């Protein structure tokens, strides 16, 4: 009997339809960097609340300097000194000027600032009581930052869903926000399945291997924006598996296992989900990562990945990562895809969609993007995944690609929504 393989797009739609954004939490604005806002951010005051100087110099009435020139300079009396945080409370009248520092409010009566370097100080130190000379006119608004140049009170400075950059944290603070609401990091329970597995710090005996998947999946989970929770290694024992899975379902928002997802005699986890929950699919038309189970257990999404490291990696990238990002409130759920030219031929005889580990580089002479597959696509090898910056996507059906053919590559080294 033929296996029932569903298209990857169908599998992605099923997974995404069974996850929702997490509850809202309040965090300091600086901790929101890299996260999408859950609500619009509205300025409570004008930003900036006053017109201020763009540089150190002298604030003037432009009308006083209208006829100023090198042959007929204009001399003004310095009646005050102003710095950021120290406001000059008077009004500048005809023939008067105030020494001003960058960021200080422009006094009433003034409409321009002349930078210090082009002003001649005639006596004293150039501060209050001095006289200074100007040899050129000043334009209205010259070297003045207008009030509300960034935003007016009541303006939306950042929209819900917009990802906060480091500069955005400063913008939010300027708008009056010490903290903001974001969607909480989902807790993702991770379990490794297999009697043959030992912890990374242990020396494996004959027939044993170190559990590498848990470390990789926890790192990928963290990178996607979630909180990984490792529940350990479960041997090929139905009761032990059920105990760990039940605990993870109770404590987490999403549960991921690796191993026990193919057709072997010891694959108990899919049977557990069928018995106590609902299996929504268990085979996908892609390589690596054909044997992937997704379902609901205790109302929580469950994803069972292959024990093969490459298959687990691709399965996480294509299914778990978009789901986690949706739970965190991100709008963009997919890695960027771009086209590149093959540097070699690729033959494929299977119908499934392939995601081969590869490296894409730009030719320094032609500017063309060139993609080269890893020398081996052995799904047990981790080094090829570490060194790959993309997945070469080969669509369904047999093909015989030649060097120079243009193909699609999924840029796993770039964040979702990146502009290429």
Feature locations, PLM:
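Helix-rich terminal scaffold detector
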Residues: 1-8, 178-305, 309-315
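Short, low-complexity N-terminal leaders and the immediately following helix N-cap/first helix
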Residues: 1-69, 99, 330-355
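Short, glycine/charged-enriched hinge/interface segments at domain edges or termini
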Residues: 2-3, 8, 59-235, 370, ...
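Conserved active-site and cofactor/substrate-binding residues in soluble primary-metabolism enzymes
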Residues: 3-10, 24-27, 31, 55, ...
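Generic secondary-structure signature for well-ordered alpha-helical cores
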Residues: 13-24, 38-42, 124, 139, ...
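Residue-level signal for inorganic ion chemistry
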Residues: 15, 57, 154, 190, ...
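Flexible glycine/proline-rich
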Residues: 25-30, 39, 85, 106, ...
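Solvent-exposed alpha-helices and their adjacent loops that cap or buttress functional pockets
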Residues: 51-53, 66-71, 89-93, 106-108, ...
């Amino acid at each position: 009997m033929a296996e029932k393989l569903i298209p990857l797009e169908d599998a992605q739609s099923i997974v995404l339809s069974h996850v929702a954004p997490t509850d809202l939490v309040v965090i300091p604005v600086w901790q929101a960097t890299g996260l999408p806002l859950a609500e619009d951010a509205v300025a409570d005051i004008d930003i900036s609340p006053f017109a201020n100087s763009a540089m150190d110099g002298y604030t003037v009435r432009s009308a006083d300097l209208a006829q100023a020139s090198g042959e007929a300079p204009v001399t003004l009396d310095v009646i005050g000194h102003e710095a950021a945080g120290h406001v000059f409370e008077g009004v500048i009248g005809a023939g008067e000027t105030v020494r001003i520092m960058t960021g200080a409010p422009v006094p009433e009566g003034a409409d321009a600032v002349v930078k210090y370097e082009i002003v001649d100080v005639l006596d004293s130190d150039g501060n209050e009581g001095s006289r200074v000379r100007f040899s050129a006119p000043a334009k209205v608004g010259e070297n003045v930052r207008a009030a509300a140049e960034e935003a007016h009170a009541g303006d939306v400075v950042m929209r819900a869903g917009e990802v906060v950059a480091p500069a955005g944290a400063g913008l939010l603070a300027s708008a009056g926000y010490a903290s903001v609401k974001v969607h909480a990091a989902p807790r993702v329970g991770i379990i490794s399945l297999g009697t043959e597995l030992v912890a990374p710090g242990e020396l494996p005996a004959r027939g044993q291997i170190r559990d590498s998947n848990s470390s990789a999946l926890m790192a990928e989970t963290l990178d996607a924006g979630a909180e990984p929770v490792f529940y350990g290694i479960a041997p090929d024992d139905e009761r032990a598996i059920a105990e760990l899975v039940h605990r993870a379902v109770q404590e987490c928002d999403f549960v991921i296992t690796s191993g026990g997802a193919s057709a072997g005699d010891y694959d108990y986890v899919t049977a557990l989900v069928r018995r106590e929950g609902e299996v929504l699919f268990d085979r996908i038309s892609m390589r690596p990562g054909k044997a992937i189970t997704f379902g609901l257990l205790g109302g929580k999404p469950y994803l069972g990945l292959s024990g093969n490291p490459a298959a687990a990696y691709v399965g996480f990238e294509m299914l778990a990562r978009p789901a986690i990002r949706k739970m965190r409130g991100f709008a963009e759920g997919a890695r960027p895809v771009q086209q590149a030219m093959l540097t070699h031929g690729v033959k494929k005889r299977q119908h499934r969609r392939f995601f081969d580990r590869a490296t894409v580089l730009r030719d320094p002479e032609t500017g063309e993007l060139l993609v080269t597959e890893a020398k081996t696509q052995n799904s047990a090898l981790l080094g090829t995944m570490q060194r790959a910056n993309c997945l070469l996507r080969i669509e369904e059906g047999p093909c015989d690609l030649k060097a120079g053919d243009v193909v699609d590559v999924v840029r796993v080294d770039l964040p979702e929504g990146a502009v290429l």
